[in-house]
C-alpha cells in the first residue's frame, strides 16, 4: 500500500538484521568450507565464484560482516556482494547509450554517463535535465558499474529523457568515511565545471541543462545525497540544484528516533557495528557520528541547497522511521523548499533495485521520473 503521509505500522522484522543496508542478494548464501585436494576452498556469496584459502596464517579471517566484507590478517579485503560489473556501451541498449569518464585521476575514480540515444540526433541547444546519482551499498559495496545501478539508470534516462551521471567514490574499509563525501563533492564540482559549456566532457557540455540539476541516491547514496545538498547550500553552488531524491536513506543513531523505530538492541548494535568497525572506525561518536546520525546530530537543515526534496521510505526497511523523522525535521527546519514523502508500507529496503518486477516497482519509477520531469 502506498501512503503519502506518515503513519504507524508494525516494527521492521528482526530478520532484517543482516539486510539493513541492502537486502541479501538472491544468490547469497553463508560462506561454507569444503575440502578439495587437501586444501580448503571457501565458497563466496556469488555461487559461481570459488577461492582457494590455503592453510597459513595470512589467510586468517580477523573480521567478517556478511553480506558486505571479510578482512584477512594479511590485510586482504574480500567483498561478499556487489562486485559484479557490466560495461558501458555506445551501442543503444533500451534506447540509451553509456560511457565511463575519469573525473579524479588521483584516486582513479570515474563517472558513468547515460544519454538517450535520440538526443545525439538533436540540434545543439536542446538541453536535458541532469541527474547526478550516488549508489548505495553501505559505503562498502556496489559501484556505478553494478548491474542493478546500470539497469536502473538506463530505465530512468529512457523514461525521463535526461542525462544521468552515476558517481564512483572511494569505499570502506580501504578508505573510510569521509572519503566518500569528499569524492562525491569533487564529482559535483567536476560536473559543474561544464556549466558554461567548456568542460572536458562533451556529453555534459552539449546536453546538460544546469537549470535542471537533480541529486539522487539510495541507502548510503541517499545519505550522501542529503549531505551533498547541504554542502551545495553552504558553498552557494551555482546554478542552484533544482531537487534531491533521497531513497531509503541509511540514517541511524545509538537511540531510536521514536517508539516505532527499531528497539531491538541486537539490531541497533549490529547496524552500529558496521559503521564503527568498517565504515568509519576513526569516528569518536560511533553511530552518533553526524555523517550517520543525520536526524539527531543537531544539524540545521535550513540551508539545504535545492528547491525541492522527495523522500522515499519503505515500511519493512530498518531505516523506515529514520527516513520519516528526516523528512519531518526538514519540514520544520525553516527551509523554504518543498518536501514530499512517499511511503511504501509493504516493501523492504531498495526493493525497486533488488526486485524490479515487484508490484510497486513501476509506481516507484513513475514517481522518481515525475520528480525530474515535473
From Swiss-Prot:
It holds the Pfam family Abhydrolase_3. It is an enzyme of class 3 (hydrolase). Keywords: Hydrolase, Mitochondrion, Serine esterase, Transit peptide. It comes from the Eukaryota. InterPro entries: AB_hydrolase_3, AB_hydrolase_fold, Carboxylest/Gibb_receptor. GO terms for molecular function: carboxylesterase activity. Expressed in leaves, stems, flowers and siliques. It is found in: Mitochondrion. The keyword Amino-acid biosynthesis does not apply. One of its GO terms (cellular component) is cytosol. Residues 1-52 form a transit peptide. A motif (Involved in the stabilization of the negatively charged intermediate by the formation of the oxyanion hole) lies at residues 135-137. Its main location: mitochondrion. It catalyses: a carboxylic ester + H2O = an alcohol + a carboxylate + H(+). Its EC number is 3.1.1.1. The active site is at residues 219, 317, 349. The keyword Mitochondrion applies. Carboxylesterase acting on esters with varying acyl chain length. Belongs to the 'GDXG' lipolytic enzyme family. This is Probable carboxylesterase 4, mitochondrial. The lineage of its organism: Eukaryota, Viridiplantae, Streptophyta, Embryophyta, Tracheophyta.
